[in-house]
């Protein structure tokens, strides 16, 4: 009886708080039940309007794969701030920088290399998830350890970035060593959206690059394509391991409503026994659940 009175009092005094709490609990339950039926390890993190947080199976290490190109982009922004240079700075790319057996639209378009600005290289990494462009940026800034150190300076700790794309290409198991919890990656996105990290034009460029991302349209974005929202995201896609499982299929981003409300959403899928299409559908269905929860009046 006392509990009922307390709940009634909370509802009278803080109706929005109670409704939000009920909504988040229902969302957690629905996601948890859904992922328990999948032939994969699935982790989810949601941050609503920069404060309320929902996590499901967050206490695991999920391979980041190319999601770490977002972390890298922030480290590039910090590097430019410290060295007082702009994203228009040109780098010379040699043909030896363009590995042949990896995903690289940059190599396909300029097989002999050339001069490319930092902005152009980040368009390749963030729009198209180009692996060679990623390693060229690592070479420029000082390697994965520099990115790892910068992200930790933001107060994010439950992750590790140790290896380049070429490292992971040579040994698929190294993909597991670049890892994060879903919440840690959500915190990185929140830092981009809410904090002043470096020069505003550079920070806005990275945000816009997420909005115009061209990969993973069957994931977080899929159920939102006809909705009145702005979506920015970065995907990550792994190969199959020795057991035939997809090492990781990921998507991490934010959804902005016209009324100013937003949520950050990170969905990591590890060691999936499903097909690529069915694994991407897991992400899309969770994205739909989250959108519906936040669309309720």
Where are these regions (language model features)?
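Soluble periplasmic/extracytoplasmic beta-strand elements of cell-envelope proteins
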Residues: 43-47, 55, 71, 92, ...
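Mid-domain, small-residue-enriched loop/turn segments at the edges of structured enzyme/sensor domains
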Residues: 41, 114, 135-197
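Conserved catalytic neighborhood of penicillin-recognizing serine enzymes
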Residues: 98-135
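Bacterial Sec-dependent N-terminal signal peptides
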Residues: 1-25
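Structured C-terminal helix/loop/strand segments within mature extracytoplasmic catalytic/sensor domains
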Residues: 23-33, 37, 139-140, 144-145, ...
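Short, well-structured active-site flanking segments
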Residues: 78-98, 144, 199-203
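Beta-lactamase-like hydrolase cores
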Residues: 21-63, 239
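Active-site SXXK
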Residues: 63-91, 265
